[in-house]
From Swiss-Prot:
<dbReference type="GO" id="GO:0042802">
    <property type="term" value="F:identical protein binding"/>
</dbReference>
<keyword id="KW-0238">DNA-binding</keyword>
<keyword id="KW-0010">Activator</keyword>
<dbReference type="GO" id="GO:0032993">
    <property type="term" value="C:protein-DNA complex"/>
</dbReference>
<dbReference type="InterPro" id="IPR001789">
    <property type="entry name" value="Sig_transdc_resp-reg_receiver"/>
</dbReference>
<dbReference type="InterPro" id="IPR000792">
    <property type="entry name" value="Tscrpt_reg_LuxR_C"/>
</dbReference>
<protein>
    <recommendedName>
        <fullName>Nitrate/nitrite response regulator protein NarL</fullName>
    </recommendedName>
</protein>
<dbReference type="InterPro" id="IPR011006">
    <property type="entry name" value="CheY-like_superfamily"/>
</dbReference>
<dbReference type="GO" id="GO:0005829">
    <property type="term" value="C:cytosol"/>
</dbReference>
<keyword id="KW-0534">Nitrate assimilation</keyword>
<keyword id="KW-0804">Transcription</keyword>
<feature type="domain" description="Response regulatory">
    <location>
        <begin position="8"/>
        <end position="124"/>
    </location>
</feature>
<dbReference type="InterPro" id="IPR036388">
    <property type="entry name" value="WH-like_DNA-bd_sf"/>
</dbReference>
<dbReference type="GO" id="GO:0000976">
    <property type="term" value="F:transcription cis-regulatory region binding"/>
</dbReference>
<keyword id="KW-0902">Two-component regulatory system</keyword>
<dbReference type="GO" id="GO:0003677">
    <property type="term" value="F:DNA binding"/>
</dbReference>
<keyword id="KW-0678">Repressor</keyword>
Length: 216
């Protein structure tokens, strides 16, 4: 990002002090800039449409339109930026639900500042991000489903296997498309089919599964 314009971030959180703290942290990074902030979901959606930021940092628990409802609305807008949930909740249901409904990552608010800044850089670059403390949470979710869900990677086509490998490496659709010399829309179709065949809820869960089971 050093040879490009700074990555743009929109903050959607109902706590002014937290937004201020995140802005101060981001001000330390010359290649990321906060272009807008909203205290509720409705305002956040309006700003997201007008600003189309590279990254949206979204609180989960907000009065009125909550984070999941806001996430659904943002996904309906087909925005180009990544959407990462930023929450105090490490409950399995919250994490899995957010990822299933299209979040590109899930970060906890008690992260160390330097870890948060690193994660924001990764997310802005198109990578999936997940607080380290949440890996066991997703692993537990996978284990709970294992008894009733048998996943056989051999069900996948060669192309779907290639894409699963790249997802496990944290690559976004755009970079996968370049790597495989196919269109981004084709990648999206393959990802959808792959997740359905493997009975996985999200890209992040797919990545955790690959690493946990040492699929490749």
């Amino acid at each position: 990002m050093s040879n490009q314009e700074p990555a743009t971030i929109l903050l959607i959180d109902d706590h002014p002090m937290l937004r201020t703290g995140v802005k101060q942290l981001i001000s330390m990074a010359p290649d990321i800039t906060v272009v807008g902030e909203a205290s509720n979901g409705e305002q956040g959606i309006e700003l997201a449409e007008s600003l189309d930021p590279d990254l949206i940092l979204l609180d989960l628990n907000m009065p009125g339109m909550n984070g999941l409802e806001t996430l659904d609305k943002l996904r309906e807008k087909s925005l180009s930026g990544r959407i990462v949930v930023f929450s105090v909740s490490n409950h399995e249901e919250d994490v899995v639900t957010a990822l299933k409904r299209g979040a590109d990552g899930y970060l906890l608010k008690d992260m160390e500042p330097e870890d948060l800044l690193k994660a924001l850089h990764q997310a802005a670059a198109g990578e999936m991000v997940l607080s380290e403390a949440l890996t066991p949470v997703l692993a537990a979710s996978l284990r709970a489903n294992r008894a009733t869900t048998e996943r056989d990677v051999n069900q996948l086509t060669p192309r779907e296997r290639d894409i699963l490998k790249l997802i496990a490496q944290g690559l976004p659709n755009k970079m996968i498309a370049r790597r495989l010399d196919i269109t981004e829309s084709t990648v999206k179709v393959h990802v959808k089919h792959m997740l359905k065949k493997m009975k996985l809820k999200s890209r992040v869960e797919a990545a955790v599964w690959v690493h946990q089971e040492r699929i490749f």
